[in-house]
Amino acid sequence: MSDISTCQTLRADRAITSWPLQATKAIQHIHSKGVVHCDIGIHNFLIQENGTLALADFGGSRVDGSKSLEAGLPHYRRPTLARDSYPTEMDDLFSLGMVIYEIKTGEVAYVGKSDSEIRKSLESQHFPDLAPLSLEWRTIVNKCWQEEYNNAEEVLADLNGLSHSDRRESVHSC
């Protein structure tokens, strides 16, 4: 397995174009088991031998309502997390939006910014530019960032509703 965060440019094959769906299914699965990952980020998805993704690093996860001090890397962190006492499923969904953005664009959000600059950008709703994405992908990512999804099943429904051509639009990879 290799770490997806080391990827630069990907070929648009079936395995890679399905990564956003695979990432969402992984999050949906852990949420269905009462687990909140608390550190969803491209750095915690591994590429298996067959090209599919595996979610990793559950060290800071919340299980069945336990509290976690883990909050993920700054650019994956939901802006309202500071107001909450601990990470929730909503934090994982916000972070999923960043993961999808990074998979689809091949760009890491907020490169070169300090943690405090990232926090200020997120708190003021200055998210990465979605122009490189199709309208359907922009909508899904923006809904993650705007906390419009109640659960991962809703994200899956939107992903499953994408047209075949939108699912196969260019993707960046290793």
Can you say where each PLM-predicted feature lies in the sequence?
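Catalytic-loop of the protein kinase fold
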Residues: 27-48
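Short, conserved alpha-helix in the C-lobe of eukaryotic-like protein kinase catalytic domains
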Residues: 96-106
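Conserved catalytic-loop aspartate of Hanks-type protein kinases
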Residues: 92
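Activation segment/activation loop of eukaryotic-type protein kinase catalytic domains
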Residues: 43-84
